[in-house]
Curated annotation (Swiss-Prot):
Pfam families assigned: VPR
Lineage: Viruses, Riboviria, Pararnavirae, Artverviricota, Revtraviricetes
Alphabetically ordered keywords of this record: Activator, AIDS, Cell cycle, Host G2/M cell cycle arrest by virus, Host nucleus, Host-virus interaction, Modulation of host cell cycle by virus, Phosphoprotein, Transcription, Transcription regulation, Viral penetration into host nucleus, Virion, Virus entry into host cell
Protein name, UniProt field: Protein Vpr
Gene: vpr
Matches recorded under InterPro entries: RetroV_VpR/X (IPR000012)
Quaternary structure and interacting proteins, as annotated: Interacts with human UNG.
Length: 101
């Protein structure tokens, strides 16, 4: 019985993905800009300082800040932000403009 040839992983010919740290930084900046439209900048500064005191300048800290800001924005929109149709009665469904099949 002949031995099977060793498995060789395929060569990765795709373009290299952008670095994780750069992607996290871009996402954090986008969420921060959106949060500044809806929350007091002093609150966001205090939150950033709190996260920094717990995690320092790490990816874990950036991830934690992203998670908290996403939740805060979601709850803010659900509560009826005046800039959003989410959570408001009569706001309408944005998908209703798509004709049915």
């Amino acid at each position: 019985m002949a031995e099977a040839a060793p498995e060789i992983p395929p060569e990765n010919e795709n373009p290299q993905r952008e670095p994780w740290e750069e992607w996290i930084g871009e996402i954090l900046e986008e969420i921060k800009q959106e949060a500044l439209k809806h929350f007091d900048p002093r609150l966001l500064t205090a939150l950033g300082n709190f996260i920094y005191s717990r995690h320092g300048d790490t990816l874990a800290g950036a991830g934690e800040l992203i998670k908290i800001l996403q939740r805060a924005l979601f709850l803010h929109f659900r509560a009826g932000c005046q800039h959003s149709r989410i959570g408001q009665s009569g706001g309408g469904n944005p998908l209703s403009t798509i004709p049915p099949p």
